[in-house]
Amino acid sequence: MKLAYWMYAGPAHIGTLRIASSFKNVHAIMHAPLGDDYFNVMRSMLERERNFTPVTASIVDRNVLARGSQEKVVDNIVRKDQEERPDLIVLTPTCTSSILQEDLENFVARAQLDAQGDVILADVNHYRVNELQAGDRTLQQIVQFYINKARKKGDLATEKTPQPSVNIIGISTLGFHNNHDIRELKTLMAELGISVNLVIPDKASVHDLKKLPQAWFNLVPYRELGLPTAKYLEQEFDQPYVDITPMGVVETARCIRAIQGAINDQGATADYEAFIEEQTLHVSQAAWFSRSIDCQNLTGKKAIVFGDNTHAVAMTKILAREMGIHVVLAGTYCKYDADWFRQEVSEYCDEILISEDHGEIADAIARLEPAAIFGTQMERHVGKRLNIPCGVIAAPIHIQNFPIGYRPFVGYEGTNQIADLVYNSFTLGMEDHLLEIFGGHDTKEVITTTMSASSDLNWTTEAQGQLNKVPGFVRGKVKRNTEKYARAQGLSEISLEVLYAAKESVGA
């Protein structure tokens, strides 16, 4: 456990709660001290939910510490079972309450005697895994629980649907543009003549999970959520899965071809080549845009990409392959899946950074001085401090990246959205310079381009005035070069003479 003022992936219990609250009529009981129960507020605000978040905190207080938790936890489970009538109650501790080392399995067994619905304990090690890994494990656990339950009852639906069908696995609450992506994926499947059997966990009933084996194949659009579940279903029912994220023109085509292979292996005679060509050349604007003069203006411009594995890999490939943008650094905070990330992006970028430390990423951005950043909410903050534009492409995100309008990132409409995001993220031509010449509300003060809080150098008024005359898009570089020169000369003050000497030293 570590104290941090910014985390890319939250603690494990957040992942479990995201899965539980994504299902329909499932309630989560969180065994936690006050302070760990912020999930309800976060979800209600970010997802703009009309309904109450189905999560209850069973607070660990001094009475619990004195007498033990069993009575309180069991009472809370039974009370919620009677009040809400959920199909399933998931009990989860947090990393804080795990310190108590209580036998929560026993609490669940005791509560199950009085509860009408099912009760399970989230099988997650809260010290070893983060939000993404815990969500992945919880989804697999719930699917396994209901598959085994149906098997015992003898009503497991294993016969395939007459026409090709798919389970879409991994759409959850608080996911990056998930509610837009699922609409686009459903549209894409309909155009391919494939019916959607189930979408899990988003708005799915746990009683429908026994129908999962009926689909011809499983689609896992995000690497962070759903892969273990798909592998379990493949192992149990010989059900193939496609785990290619359909993001960008090239990867969407690759995903569709993989789907074609999966259903044709089971007796279908699908041929999607004409569909891919039609969408790529005429429906999606992205392929046309990438050959236009607007996009050619971006060729060779430097960009940094950072996010979760799915979005960072997809974005790196789109920028490098489809738009000719020079990716100087690609990074991820998913350290547990670092090998896959390296394998996917190594040929498309100069540097790879795998880190959960936002300061390390900020320093890399300041060092490399890209023309644009594509990252999370944190990289957006860094970009604002460094005066570098940033397009947000991955969670964690704030409210403005839960848009009300339709903004998918996957499929062919997703390619249009990404093209817009990329183009609008770069500062166009002399835009900044013109704004400064003509003044107005957009005039910017000089800001430092180092991520440290203070500088050991003082600028004289004359030198600062001269620096202000430098066009905005190179001013940061001039400032850094001058300060670097001053430090090398052992100076503590930067005057006009020092500024000119620094300029000469770099041959400008």
Swiss-Prot record:
The gene is chlB. This is Light-independent protochlorophyllide reductase subunit B. It catalyses: chlorophyllide a + oxidized 2[4Fe-4S]-[ferredoxin] + 2 ADP + 2 phosphate = protochlorophyllide a + reduced 2[4Fe-4S]-[ferredoxin] + 2 ATP + 2 H2O. Component of the dark-operative protochlorophyllide reductase (DPOR) that uses Mg-ATP and reduced ferredoxin to reduce ring D of protochlorophyllide (Pchlide) to form chlorophyllide a (Chlide). This reaction is light-independent. The NB-protein (ChlN-ChlB) is the catalytic component of the complex. InterPro entries: ChlB/BchB/BchZ, LI-POR_suB-like_C, Nase/OxRdtase_comp1, P-CP_red_C, Protochl_reductB, Protochlorophyllide_Rdtase. Its cofactor is [4Fe-4S] cluster. GO terms for molecular function: 4 iron, 4 sulfur cluster binding; ATP binding; metal ion binding; oxidoreductase activity, acting on iron-sulfur proteins as donors; oxidoreductase activity, acting on the CH-CH group of donors, iron-sulfur protein as acceptor. CDD domains: Pchlide_reductase_B. [4Fe-4S] cluster binds at D36. It is an enzyme of class 1 (oxidoreductase). One of its GO terms (biological process) is photosynthesis, dark reaction. Pathway: Porphyrin-containing compound metabolism; chlorophyll biosynthesis (light-independent).
